[in-house]
Amino acid sequence: MASIAVCPGSFDPVTFGHLDIIRRGAKVFDKVYVCVLNNSSKKPLFTVEERCGLLREVTQDIPNVQVESFQGLLIDYAKSKQANVILRGLRAVSDFEYEMQGTSMNKVLDENIETFFMMTNNQYSFLSSSIVKEVAKYKGSVAELVPEAVEAALEKKFAKNERP
């Protein structure tokens, strides 16, 4: 049986921390679906389509990664892809507490889908999309935090005086 993972997130925008988890996950699993979720509790800077486009651009060199979007329950998306794993990145203990709730709910919805936690590399342990947007908003350099395509997209967004 092929190992198929779903790596969900809002990716607003995708950072080197996200890419670290995606790349490492692609070495562990036969197929990784990167699923851009529309989180109704967040006001995104980039549209779902823009986020998918950026993710496709920065993962095009990883043959077993496919980027898609989904609205609804993550567990339903995972089942539709015949995934047996949900791949999640952790930066700190606070991430674990949040992720534990989601994992427990997913187990109630489908006990056959496992959650696989992967710690980010230390150099990305502080990194979040929110931090990236805040730095970019005030014209700080995000070159060490995001791929070039994302940096350019952020510059374009904030040149229009759009706010995160």
From Swiss-Prot:
Marked site positions, Transition state stabilizer: H18
Pfam families assigned: CTP_transf_like
Binding site for ATP: S10, F11, H18, G89, L90, R91, E99, Y124, S125, F126, L127, S128, S129, S130
Molecular function terms, GO-annotated: ATP binding; pantetheine-phosphate adenylyltransferase activity
EC id: 2.7.7.3
Any one GO CC term of the record: cytoplasm
Keyword Translocase found: no
Catalytic activity: (R)-4'-phosphopantetheine + ATP + H(+) = 3'-dephospho-CoA + diphosphate
Kinase recorded as keyword: no
Top EC class of this enzyme: transferase
Record's subcellular location: Cytoplasm
Principal place of residence: cytoplasm
InterPro entries tied to this protein: Cyt_trans-like, PPAT, Rossmann-like_a/b/a_fold
GO biological process, one term: coenzyme A biosynthetic process
Cofactor: Mg(2+)
Binding site for substrate: S10, K42, L74, R88
Annotated keywords: ATP-binding, Coenzyme A biosynthesis, Cytoplasm, Magnesium, Nucleotide-binding, Nucleotidyltransferase, Transferase
Pathway info: Cofactor biosynthesis; coenzyme A biosynthesis; CoA from (R)-pantothenate: step 4/5
The protein's assembly and partners: Homohexamer.
Function summary: Reversibly transfers an adenylyl group from ATP to 4'-phosphopantetheine, yielding dephospho-CoA (dPCoA) and pyrophosphate.
NCBIfam families: coaD_prev_kdtB, cyt_tran_rel
HAMAP family associated with the record: PPAT_bact
Family stated for the protein in its record: Belongs to the bacterial CoaD family.
Name the UniProt record assigns to this protein: Phosphopantetheine adenylyltransferase
